[in-house]
C-alpha cells in the first residue's frame, strides 16, 4: 500500500525536529517503520545510531517485526527499538559506574515495592492500605517530576507530605543499600545523569543520532526531559502523537508536552495525518464533532474513504441488568445474522466494576469472552519464583528475592531462623544471603534451621559460581537441583495444573537460552541483563496478551487505546459514569471527552451506545442523566430507541429469556446441520 501525501512528507522530512500529529487509525506505525527504512537507505544513517521508543512491549515488538520485514534482519541489526523504560535500563547498564552503582543491580516489581514500604513505614503510617497506595503514587509522581527525596522534603506542604517525603527518603536509601531499582528509577536516573554529566550526555547524543518517539502525548515530565537531553542541539528527531488521545494524566502524562515542543524547538515542523484507514465516515464525523468541544492548539479533522456507513444506535435500558441483557441479545442476533466471529465485538466501559453483569449474561448464554487485564506470563507464581532465584544469583544484595526463595520449595527454615538472620545481617550492614556465610552466625543460630539454611545458601553459591562461566548450564542445574517439578505437583490443585506450570518454567528457560546465546538481530546478553529484562517485561505487560481467540472482548476505555474492532458497544453512557463523577467534581471534562473519543474511534463498522434509566450505586437507586457526550454527537446520525410501554420486571425478564432462548435454539440448529 502506497503512502498518502501526509505520510510521505512525514517520512521524508529528516533535516530538523518534526512533530507528526497522527489521528486515530491514520497509519502512524507505517510512517515510523518507513521513516526508519528511509533514514538507513536514503540518508546514510547506520541502524545502530537510530532509536525508536514507544510505551508498550507489544508496540515495540510490532514495530521491530515491521522494520525487519521492510529492511531485512541484516540491515536492521543494531537498531534500538524499545520502550522508554527499556532504553532507560540500557543507559543504566552501560553507565552504572557514573551512577555510583554496582553492575549487578536488580529490579523491584510492585509487589516488592509494596512489601518494602509496608515494612519501612511501620509506626509512621497506620496499617492503612489506601494511605500506603497514596504513598506509592506520590513517590512515583515525585520521581516522574525528577524530584529527589531532599527536594520532595523541601517542597512538602502539610503534615502528610512531610511524612511521605520522609518515607521516600527511607525507601530510596534502602533501594541504594540493596543495589535495587524500581520502575520509575529507569527514567529518573538516566535523566538526572544526562543532566549532570556532560561526558555521558555527549556519549549518548553521539550514539543516538536520530530519535523517533511514538505516543508522545503520553510522555511525563521526566520522559520529555530525557528526549530533550538525548537529541541535544542537533534536534534530529520525530515524535508522533495525538493530543485528542491523551487519556493518562492520572499517571503523570502531560499532553502539553506536544505544545512545549514548539517552544523548545522553534524550527519544529508539524505534519498532520488526517486520513483514517479504520472507521466509516459516520463514525469519524461523530468523533470529530465530539472532540471539537475541547480547546485545541493543533486543529485536525479525520476523514475516511471507506464509505459513510451505518447509523449509530443508542439503546436505553431500565437498569444495569437490563443493559447487559440487551447488549448480549443484540450481540447474539447480530452474530447469527451476519455470520461474524465473536472476536469482532468489543464491549467498552469506563470502570472495571461495570464488567461483572456483562460477564454474567455472556456466561449464561455460553458466549466466549475475554476481559483484558489478564495475568501476564511473567506475573505467574512459578515464573516469579524462578526469577527471584535468578535475582539472588545476579544480585546477592536483593533481600526481597532471597525471602521469596528461601522456603520455595519448603526447606524447614522457619520464621525464627529468618528473623535472627535478618537482625544479624542488619547490624553488620550486609544482605541476608551474604550474612548467611558469616562464621560467627553459628553462635546465634543452631539446630535444623541453621543446617537447612547453610545447605541452601552453599548450594546456591555453587550455582552462582557456575553461572559466571556457563549461565545456561547454571539455570538448568538450578531448576533440577531444587526439584521444582516435584514441588509444583505437591502444591498445584491438579496434575494438569502442575504440568502447565512446569511448561511455563521450560518456556522461560527456552527464552533465556535464546537471549543468552543472541541472534542475528540481537547481541548475546549476560544473565544479569536477561533477569532485569524479564522483570521489566512483567511490570510492563500486565494485561497484555498474545493470544487471539474467538472471544468477545470486554475492556475499559483506557485499555482499548490502540485497538480496533468491527462492532463496538460503548456502555454506561451516563453522567457520573462517562464523564466520571470525579472528573465532573474536579471540572476535568476535557480528558473524559478524549476518553469517549478514543472509544468511538475503536469502531470500524458499527457503533452502539447504551445507557440506563436507573442504577444501583452504593446500595441506593439513582436515576442518572444521559451523558453530555451523547448530546454533543450529531443527532442526525444517531438512532435513539423510541420509548416503549412500561412493562413489569417479571414480564421483561420472561420476554428477554424467551428471545435469548429462541436465538440459542437457532444457533444450536445451525450447529447441528
From Swiss-Prot:
SUPFAM superfamilies for this protein: P-loop containing nucleoside triphosphate hydrolases
Keyword rRNA-binding: no
Keyword Protease attached: no
Record's catalysed reaction(s): Couples ATP hydrolysis with the unwinding of duplex DNA by translocating in the 3'-5' direction; ATP + H2O = ADP + phosphate + H(+)
Binding locations of ATP: 22-29, 278
UniProt GO BP: bacterial-type DNA replication; DNA replication, synthesis of primer; recombinational repair; replication fork processing; response to radiation
Ranges of residues in domain UvrD-like helicase C-terminal: 281-562
EC number per UniProt: 5.6.2.4
Enzyme category, top tier: isomerase
One of the record's GO cellular component terms: cytoplasmic replisome
Gene deletion effect: No growth phenotype, resumption of DNA synthesis after arrest of DNA replication (upon UV treatment) is slower than wild-type. Cells are filamented, slightly accumulate DNA double-strand breaks, have viability defects at 15 ng/ml ciprofoxacin. Double priA-rep deletion is synthetically lethal, makes small colonies but not lethal in association with priA300 (which has no 3'-5' helicase activity). Synthetically lethal with a priB deletion.
Any one GO molecular-function label of the UniProt entry: 3'-5' DNA helicase activity
Keywords: ATP-binding, DNA replication, DNA-binding, Helicase, Hydrolase, Isomerase, Nucleotide-binding
Activity regulation as described: Binding to DNA induces dimerization, which is required for DNA helicase activity. Helicase activity is stimulated by PriC.
A Pfam family annotated for this UniProt entry: UvrD_C
Domain UvrD-like helicase ATP-binding: 1-280
Role description: Rep helicase is a single-stranded (ss)DNA-dependent ATPase involved in DNA replication; it can initiate unwinding at a nick in the DNA. It binds to ssDNA and acts in a progressive fashion along the DNA in the 3' to 5' direction. Binds double-stranded (ds)DNA with a 5' ss- but not 3' ss-extension and forked structures with either lagging or leading ssDNA. Part of the PriC-Rep pathway for restart of stalled replication forks, which reloads the DnaB replicative helicase on sites other than the origin of replication.
Record-linked HAMAP family: Helicase_Rep
Quaternary structure note: Homodimer in association with DNA.
Family: Belongs to the helicase family. UvrD subfamily.
NCBIfam families, sorted: PRK10919.1, rep
PANTHER family associated with the record: ATP-DEPENDENT DNA HELICASE REP (PTHR11070:SF64), UVRD / RECB / PCRA DNA HELICASE FAMILY MEMBER (PTHR11070)
Protein name, entry field: ATP-dependent DNA helicase Rep
Amino acid at each position: 500500500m502506497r503512502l498518502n501525501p501526509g505520510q510521505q512528507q512525514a517520512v521524508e522530512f529528516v533535516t530538523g525536529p518534526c512533530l507528526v500529529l497522527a489521528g486515530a487509525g491514520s497509519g502512524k506505525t507505517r510512517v515510523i517503520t518507513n521513516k526508519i527504512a528511509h533514514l538507513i537507505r536514503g540518508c546514510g544513517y547506520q541502524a545502530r545510531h537510530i532509536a525508536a521508543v514507544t510505551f508498550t512491549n507489544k508496540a515495540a515488538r510490532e514495530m521491530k517485526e515491521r522494520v525487519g520485514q521492510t529492511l531485512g534482519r541484516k540491515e536492521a541489526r543494531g537498531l534500538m527499538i524499545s520502550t522508554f523504560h527499556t532504553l532507560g535500563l540500557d543507559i543504566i547498564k552501560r553507565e552504572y559506574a557514573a551512577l555510583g552503582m554496582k553492575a549487578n543491580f536488580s529490579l523491584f516489581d510492585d509487589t516488592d515495592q509494596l512489601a518494602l514500604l509496608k515494612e519501612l513505614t511501620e509506626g509512621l503510617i497506620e496499617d492503612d492500605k489506601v494511605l500506603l497506595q497514596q504513598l506509592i503514587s506520590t513517590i512515583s509522581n515525585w520521581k516522574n517530576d525528577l524530584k529527589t527525596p531532599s527536594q520532595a522534603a523541601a517542597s512538602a506542604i502539610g503534615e502528610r507530605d512531610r511524612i511521605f517525603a520522609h518515607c521516600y527518603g527511607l525507601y530510596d536509601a534502602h533501594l541504594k543499600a540493596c543495589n535495587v531499582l524500581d520502575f520509575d528509577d529507569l527514567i529518573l536516573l538516566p535523566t538526572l545523569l544526562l543532566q549532570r554529566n556532560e561526558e555521558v550526555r555527549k556519549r549518548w547524543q553521539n550514539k543516538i543520532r536520530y530519535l523517533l518517539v511514538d505516543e508522545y502525548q503520553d510522555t511525563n515530565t521526566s520522559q520529555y526531559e530525557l528526549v530533550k537531553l538525548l537529541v541535544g542541539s542537533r534536534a534530529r528527531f520525530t515524535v508522533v502523537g495525538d493530543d485528542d488521545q491523551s487519556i493518562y494524566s492520572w499517571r503523570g502524562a502531560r499532553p502539553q508536552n506536544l505544545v512545549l515542543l514548539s517552544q523548545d524547538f522553534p524550527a519544529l515542523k508539524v505534519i498532520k495525518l488526517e486520513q483514517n484507514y479504520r472507521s466509516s465516515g459516520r463514525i469519524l464525523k461523530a468523533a470529530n464533532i465530539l472532540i471539537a468541544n475541547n480547546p485545541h492548539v493543533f486543529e485536525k479533522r479525520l476523514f475516511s474513504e471507506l464509505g459513510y456507513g451505518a447509523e449509530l444506535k443508542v439503546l436505553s435500558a431500565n437498569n444495569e441488568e437490563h443493559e447487559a441483557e440487551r447488549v448480549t441479545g443484540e450481540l447474539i442476533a447480530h452474530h447469527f445474522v451476519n455470520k461474524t466471529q465473536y472476536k469482532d465485538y468489543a464491549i467498552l466501559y469506563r470502570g472495571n466494576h461495570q464488567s461483572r453483569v456483562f460477564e454474567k449474561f455472556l456466561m449464561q448464554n455460553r458466549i466466549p469472552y475475554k476481559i483484558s487485564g489478564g495475568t501476564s506470563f511473567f506475573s505467574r507464581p512459578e515464573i516469579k519464583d524462578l526469577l527471584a532465584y535468578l535475582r539472588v544469583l545476579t544480585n546477592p544484595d536483593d533481600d526481597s528475592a532471597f525471602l521469596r526463595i528461601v522456603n520455595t520449595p519448603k526447606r524447614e527454615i522457619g520464621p525464627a531462623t529468618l528473623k535472627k538472620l535478618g537482625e544479624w545481617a542488619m547490624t553488620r550492614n550486609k544482605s541476608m544471603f551474604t550474612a548467611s556465610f558469616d562464621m560467627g552466625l553459628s553462635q546465634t543460630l543452631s539446630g535444623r534451621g541453621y543446617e537447612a539454611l547453610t545447605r541452601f545458601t552453599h548450594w546456591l553459591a555453587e550455582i552462582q559460581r557456575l553461572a559466571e562461566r556457563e549461565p545456561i548450564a547454571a539455570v538448568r542445574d538450578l531448576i533440577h537441583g531444587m526439584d521444582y517439578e516435584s514441588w509444583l505437583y505437591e502444591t498445584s490443585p491438579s496434575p494438569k495444573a502442575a504440568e502447565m506450570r512446569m511448561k511455563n518454567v521450560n518456556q522461560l528457560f527456552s527464552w533465556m537460552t535464546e537471549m543468552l546465546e543472541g541472534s542475528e538481530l540481537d547481541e548475546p546478553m549476560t544473565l544479569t541483563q536477561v533477569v532485569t529484562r524479564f522483570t521489566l517485561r512483567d511490570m510492563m505487560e500486565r494485561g497484555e496478551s498474545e493470544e487471539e481467540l474467538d472471544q468477545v472482548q470486554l475492556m475499559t476505555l483506557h485499555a482499548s487505546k490502540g485497538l480496533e474492532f468491527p462492532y463496538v458497544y460503548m456502555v454506561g453512557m451516563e453522567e457520573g459514569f462517562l464523564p466520571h463523577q470525579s472528573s465532573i467534581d474536579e471540572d476535568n471534562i476535557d480528558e473524559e471527552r478524549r476518553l469517549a473519543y478514543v472509544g468511538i474511534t475503536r469502531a470500524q463498522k458499527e457503533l452502539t451506545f447504551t445507557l440506563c434509566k436507573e442504577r444501583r450505586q452504593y446500595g441506593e437507586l439513582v436515576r442518572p442523566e444521559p451523558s453530555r457526550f451523547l448530546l454533543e454527537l450529531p443527532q442526525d446520525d444517531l438512532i435513539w430507541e423510541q420509548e416503549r410501554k412500561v412493562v413489569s420486571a417479571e414480564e421483561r425478564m420472561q420476554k428477554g429469556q424467551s428471545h435469548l432462548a429462541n436465538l440459542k435454539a437457532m444457533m444450536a440448529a445451525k450447529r447441528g446441520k
